[in-house]
Design a protein with these regions (language model features):
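Arg/Lys-rich, intrinsically disordered low-complexity tails that mediate electrostatic binding
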Residues: 1-22
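Active-site rim segments in enzyme catalytic domains, especially the processed small/beta chain
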Residues: 166-259, 266, 322
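C-terminus-biased signal that marks the final domain/tail of proteins
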Residues: 21-157, 163-167, 181, 195-198, ...
Length: 469
């Protein structure tokens, strides 16, 4: 704990002078911790919207420059198969005026990120790039086709409370499933402290330049904690007409200004563009209540519990959402053990409702997220495309790896938290596959020459221990 005189929430008044850019930005309202913690980069920003954004941009300027010059253009070319310039223009045309009008605070923060990164690097990093990067998940379904599916099937997660857990408190757990290139940017733990009167502070896993989490793992000062799993196979494209707004602005609004689970629902439903359909798993640590909130385009599902479990595996729990808003293949595969979401559904149901019900704690939450049991073969594996800790890069079955055999996609992190940890403003995180598996880009590319065009961006991953963050 700090011993020197502090301002709000324990941040030293002279903290700004301890950033890595003190010579150019002596009054920056932010701090980057000097060393990574088991692979995680930790930063804190505070002040008004532009000040927070500016500090964010300065502190993560090196990472943002790499995303602008290499990573985002690669992702757009690989997954959307359009020129990057077209993608950035599409984002501007669809979202720029809407965000500026509907969310002026967040527009200021985005502008600050661009200004801070430009100042720190000496290169132009535009707000259009920052917007296009934030909008990656929102725009994914715009370009979905049989040749390049959207970035769904992204996570495994659960939340439990009451008689389902060892102590009765809330336990929440989540791992991200993603392509290894974009996933490698999500090692940021960002704390945001707004000025008094501008909402509550937030702590979240995120990527450089993002104003919301993106991986969607967050703690809120008001006692709300949350995560989500994407609803895969949606049968519609987002609608940003008529003032409909992107999900990353709505969820940030909910995190910063929502006071209750009801507020989260209201804020997320208002202006919903259907751009990133999710099964949200939310908990109120003050009331010991959890909620499943599934939001598609026109259909939603809300369930609450003070005893029990909710989990997500990239299919809607709601039969109505599956029937109305997902493609037949996705809707019909809810319990299909040969398909990734169906297989994880079967395994999560067994682990959460049979093996660990009444005993769920932080330790076995980590075990569940690391699980490599393949229900289609009834055997333990080293991990594959069907397991909770997913490894599509080790998979040659097309039903288990729909993007193709040995695709560099899978589990890239793990996070767990309890109510008591959240109240102490911390969680446990593992950077890299939840199981601890080490991924060597060099070894992978030597074995799988079809991915040689990934060589300039594919990272090494894994091998880090869990960290308290």
């Amino acid at each position: 704990m700090p011993t020197k005189k502090t301002s709000r929430k324990g941040i030293p008044k002279n903290q700004a002078r301890k950033t890595r850019n003190t010579r150019t930005d002596p009054l920056i309202k932010g701090k980057r911790f000097p060393k990574k913690k088991n692979g995680w980069i930790r930063i804190c920003v505070w002040g008004n919207a532009f000040e927070r954004g500016y500090a964010h941009g300065v502190l993560l300027s090196k990472e943002l420059l790499e995303i602008r010059e290499k990573i985002l253009p690669f992702l757009v070319k690989t997954f959307y198969q359009i020129p990057y310039e077209q993608y950035e223009k599409d984002c501007h045309d669809q979202l720029y005026d809407t965000i500026r009008t509907e969310y002026p605070e967040f527009f200021e923060e985005l502008s600050g990120i661009a200004a801070g990164a430009s100042s720190s690097t000496g290169k132009t990093i535009s707000i259009d790039f920052i917007l296009a990067w934030n909008a990656d998940l929102s725009m994914s379904n715009m370009y979905k086709s049989k040749k390049h599916p959207s970035k769904d099937e992204r996570c495994s997660a659960f939340i439990a409370v009451g008689d389902a857990t060892e102590t009765g408190e809330i336990i929440m757990a989540h791992n991200t499933h993603s392509d290894f290139v974009s996933a490698n940017t999500f090692n940021i733990v960002l704390e945001i402290i707004p000025n008094k009167g501008d909402g509550k502070k937030i702590k979240m896993q995120t990527a450089p330049g993002f104003i919301a989490s993106g991986s969607d793992w967050f703690l809120c000062e008001n006692g709300i904690i949350g995560c989500e799993t994407t609803i895969g196979g949606t049968n519609y494209k987002p609608d940003f007409s008529g003032g409909q707004t992107p999900y990353f602005c709505r969820i940030r609004q909910a995190m910063q200004y929502g006071e209750s689970l009801d507020d989260f629902v209201r804020i997320m439903q208002k202006g919903n563009a259907g751009d990133y359909a999710c099964s949200w798993l939310l908990g109120d640590t003050r009331k010991k209540e959890i909620m499943l909130f599934e939001l598609g385009l026109k259909t939603s599902n809300i369930e609450r519990k003070t005893n029990g479990v909710f989990y997500g595996m990239n299919k809607a729990i709601s039969p109505e959402i599956r029937e109305k808003e997902t493609e037949p293949k996705s809707a019909n595969g809810f319990w299909d053990m040969n398909e990734t979401s169906g297989a994880r559904n079967i395994r999560l149901h067994f682990l959460l409702y049979e093996k660990y019900y009444g005993k769920i704690n932080l330790s076995n939450a980590q075990t569940i997220l690391s699980d490599h049991y393949d229900v289609s073969t009834n055997e333990e594996t080293r991990g594959n495309g069907l397991t909770i800790c997913r490894h599509a890069n080790l998979e040659d079955r097309i039903t288990a790896s729909p993007r193709g055999a040995f695709y560099p996609w899978g589990c890239t992190d793990g996070k767990v938290v309890s109510s008591s940890m959240a109240k102490r403003w911390s969680f446990l995180g593992r950077w890299g596959p939840t199981c601890g598996h080490v991924f060597s880009a060099k070894d992978f590319l030597e074995k799988h020459l079809q991915f040689k065009n990934w060589s300039s961006v594919l990272p090494n991953m894994g091998g880090n221990p869990w960290a308290r963050l």
